[in-house]
Structures are given as C-alpha cells and as structure tokens.
Amino acid sequence: MIVRLFWLAVLWLALANANPLKRLNHVWSQRGVAKDDFLVTSLPGLSENIASDDVPLMFAGQLELYPENNTHYFFWKFSDQKKEPEAANRTIFWLNGGPGCSSMDGALMEAGPLRIGKDYKVQLNEGSWHRKGDVVFVDQPAGTGFSYSRDYDVELYQIEYHFLQFLKKYFELFPEDAHNDIVLAGESYAGQYIPYIAHGILERNKKLADGESPYHLKGLAIGNGWISPNEQSLSFVPFAVQAGLVSQKDPGWKAILQQHMKCQDLVAASHEDDTFGANSVVDKECEKVLNTILYELVDHSASQYEQCINMYDYTLRDSFPSCGMNWPPDLSNVNHFLKSDEVMSSLNLVQQISWTECSEHVGKQMKARHSKPAITLFADLLAEVEILLFHGNRDIICNYMGAESMIKKLHWGGQTGFSADSPVLKWFHGDEEAGYVKSERNLTFVNVFDASHMVPFDKPEVSSALVDILFKRFTVADDKLQTQAKKTNANQNDSPSASENDNESGRTSESASSSPSESAATETESHATRIVRLIQLAVIIILIWGLCAIYSTYRSKPTSIIKTKPSGRKKNVQWADLMPQEEPAPKGFLSKTLNKLSRTEHKYVPVDIELGPTDGMDDASSDSGPSNVGTAETPEFVIASDDEENAHEHTEEH
C-alpha cells in the first residue's frame, strides 16, 4: 500500500508540473513575445516569382498592447537584404486612413515590396519603399484589418496614445531598431493620424522617464492627405472646373454651386466663432459638395460600369453610385490572398480574423468630435521636423488644389505660406518629368503627375524617390530638381497592377527571407519543441499506466479502501486531477471615401470618402465626452472598399 501511495504521489507531481495541457496553455500565452514568433518565411509564390536576393526579410503578427482589453495591433515589417548605407538605420511606419482602413492596402498595392497577381501569388514591386529603409505597415486603430480589441477609439488623441504604446512594444521586440531614424508615412485620413502621432512622439521626448531613450523622428510623408477639412472641402468645385469635369453650362451647375455656397458659409462662420475649424474633422454639409458633383455628372447613357467619375482618379470611370469604390483593380486579388488560411498562418496570426479592407465599426466609433483637425498641429511640428506633402494630380477627394490653398493660409516659421520668391522646381526622376516641387522652412509640397489618390500604386518607382526628396537626396540646377532613377538591366514600367506583370525570377527556397542566424534559431527552437513533446507523450503514457494500475487494484480488493465513520457513510474523496478546475475567463461623404465601409453598388448613398463616419452612423459614443472609448459590438470586421469610404456616403482612402 505504501509503495502504491508513493507512486501515486509521483504521478500527481508529474501531472501538476508536466501537464501537457498546462504546458500548451503556457506556450500559447507566451506566443508573440519573442522576435522569432513573428518571422515570415513562406508565402504563395515567394520562391516561385522572386529571386532569392530580392526576397525581403519579413516579420508579421499581432502585437499585444493591452492584455486587460485584449488589444493587439497587427504589423508587417519588410527589410531589404541589400540595404544601401543611407537606408541602414531608418524605419518607415506606414498607415492607411479610413478611419478603419487596413494598411495592407499600402503593403500589397502601394509602398510594399509585394504585389498580388491574378493567381493570388506574390510578385515583386520594383518601386518598393523598403529599399529606402525598413517599412512597417500597421493596422490601426484596433478593429482595423487584422488588429483587434474589445474597445474602439473615438478621438484622435486616443490614436496618438495607443500608437505610442505600439511603438514601445515594437521596440521591445526589435531593440536593434530603437535608435533608428523614424519616418511616419501614409495617405488620406492618415493626414489626421500622422500629425497627432508625431505630436505625441515629440512630447514624449521632452519628458522621458528614467531609462527611456528618445525616438528619433526625422520626418513625415503624407500622400493626398485629409489634413484641413475647410480648405479641402472648398476645393472640390474649383478642381472640377479646372479639370474640365464641370462648367457653368452644365444642367447640374446650379445644384453644385448651391451646395458649395452652403459649405462656404459654414467655413466663413467657423473663422468667426472657431466652431467648425477647431472642432470638426468632417462636416456633413461640406461632404455633400463632392456628392453633388458626382451625382450631377452621372452619364446614364454610358454602360453600367462607366456611368460615374472615379473620385480617386478622374480619368477613370466606375459604376454609379460606387464612383471609385471598385478601384483599384488589385483589391480583389488582395482580398482573396489575405483571407487564405495559408497566408494567415504564415503571417503568424494568433487570432485569425477574416480580413476586410475597411471596418464599418471603427468608422462609426471614430467620430473625432472633440479633436481639432491635424492642420492645427502643423506650425509646432514644422519647428522640429521635416514634413513632405505629396499629391497625385488626378485625385478629386484629396486634391492638390486644396493642399496648396491650405499652405497659403498656414502660418509657420515666422510667416504665412511659401515666400513669394520661393521657386517652383520641375521634378525629374531619371529622364521622366514626374511633377513639381516647392520647399521652404521644413515644408515640402510635391505635385505628382499622372497619379491618383494612391500615388505609389500608379507610380511605384517615382513614389519611392519621395523619400529621397524628404531627406534632401537630390540635385538642383536651372530650376530643375533631379532624383536618381533605380539602375536596372531591364526596362521597368511603373505599372499600377501586379496582375499585369509576370516576374520570371529564379526559384529560391521558401525560407530565403531569413538570415542564417534566424534560421538556426528557428531550427533550435523546433528541436527543443520536439523534445518537449516527447517528454509530454512519455508523461501521458506513465499517467495512463498508473491510473490503470490503481483502478485494477481497486477492482481486485474485496472491501473498500476507504474507512467509514460510525454513521456508515463513506468520506467524499476525489482524485486531485478529477476535482473541478476553475475555468479561465475566455481569454458624409468623406466618411464613405475615407472609410469605404460597405461596397454598395446599386443604391445611391452620400459619398463617404474614407475620411470619417457617415450620416447614418450611431452617435451614441460621443455623448459621454472625449474620454469615452467605443465598445466592440461584433467579433467580425467588415470590409468597406479599397479607398476607405463608408458605404453610407461615398468617397476615399488607402
């Protein structure tokens, strides 16, 4: 009996300390806290379509920010294996807008090294920004793309605060990058995000805690940004006239002009009482100006898919009332790619989420009712960092004329606007005239020719040179600014669609993206994991044998081994592993474009340019004050459209 009890005690200790379920739970809870947990070594087409020395070193996954509300931000980092010296210590964080539109648009259709073909396999983007520094694409705020949380942000200062927390966690994961030069880049509604985040970084640097190091913020690069709602809203009609889209002779001119005047009156009033200018990132009446233009210019005689102007590229047509929300063409490929189980596994998703381009829930919550437009931060930012604003000249919703008007009224560095004698430089990238540039007092404005709302989509090679302009890597002579085109042995086209390019690169190993040290680390970890699993299997076998032996002994005895009290009742005895266990707690219009929340194609709704929420959105979250955080209502995130518009009021972003 004593021997049996001894072995029972041994088995119980083994169960308590080597329980495979307990071990599995521990391993799962620790997943995502080590760098190797985020390594990406395989993707469909990676070895098939991309030469080994062009395969970027990649890390991706959902990084935990706050365990208390289960907040995780998804990121995808790309590093060039053949870094140029000037790019060796630089990290570019890229954000798309919405609010609520995934930065995977930027990663797979714009500034990243990969494009997705019609076969849903990756292809090389020769104009990738990762040649200019490590590029990290971040899905934020929580609820966007592959990021998740139980709470939603409702104000821009929350975006700022939570992104600083992301940076803290990110540099803990990649301490070797903590002293890199930082660039914040993005487009559309990121024109609100980026200045706020930059402001947060600069304020943090002024009051560091013991042991903290400053973040080396060197510049901002904002493409077709929604920065000043007043000036951008008042630019729709002048831009449409200048582009030849509308004239006073058109039947719809009166309706367009009337809506423009309503917006103009609101803006004028805001200059007097500071209501609109200071406290509204998007105004409904001004949203309707672009809606009215698109509606009045519908060509009912055209085919179904060409009745409306594409608000992101006025040289293209789309169905009505989509008016650009079915663009760009690569979106369907990206959507299929990111919903693949194979891809989600390769991207190290702890919580697999069905990817959507834009989240309606995020857009509904992120109303920014108590946030000043980002333009109010520019004067202070320009005193400390370089800011580059670049605009594709074919975009309507965040057009370059609105940006130029904004700059003319902006007071910074002791004066208003660019100096009268500030030169306008023709920009040549290689032999191509790519646009024009104005630069003064830390602010650079670039108009990019033949480009849409998504400049890197249309002009990948040209767009990567914008980083060179930001860091003054160019020459100037005879009013001409010259950037160096990438040297190549073959002719390369700035094609906007990966599906049109067939890359016939040499075949490489799927693990070519990892360095030898990382491969060794992964191999060692895999070996250790196998040993642990063998030990677990042995423990399970011993446990089963022990339990069987005890049961056999119990069945063979003529009397119970449990003594009874005088009452004759047996004691209530339970084995330790059979006792109840405590269950762990389960673990408008500008709104439409800026947040393409739902892709409605046969029903007209006001344009929602991925800039913010639409008229039909719930206002409940704003009633309780600026500190409120929205609560996630559903576990599923829904896609809007490629440019980041709400389906409730069409229009914008990426």
UniProtKB/Swiss-Prot annotation:
Pfam families on file: Peptidase_S10
One of the protein's GO biological processes: proteolysis
Compositional bias of kind Polar residues: 484-500, 622-631
Chain residue ranges for the region called Disordered: 484-526, 606-654
Active site: S188, D395, H453
EC number: 3.4.16.6
Cytoplasmic side: 555-654
InterPro entries the record matches: AB_hydrolase_fold, Peptidase_S10, Ser_caboxypep_his_AS, Ser_caboxypep_ser_AS
Function: Protease with a carboxypeptidase B-like function involved in the C-terminal processing of the lysine and arginine residues from protein precursors. Promotes cell fusion and is involved in the programmed cell death.
The protein's name: Pheromone-processing carboxypeptidase KEX1
Species name: Clavispora lusitaniae (strain ATCC 42720) (Yeast)
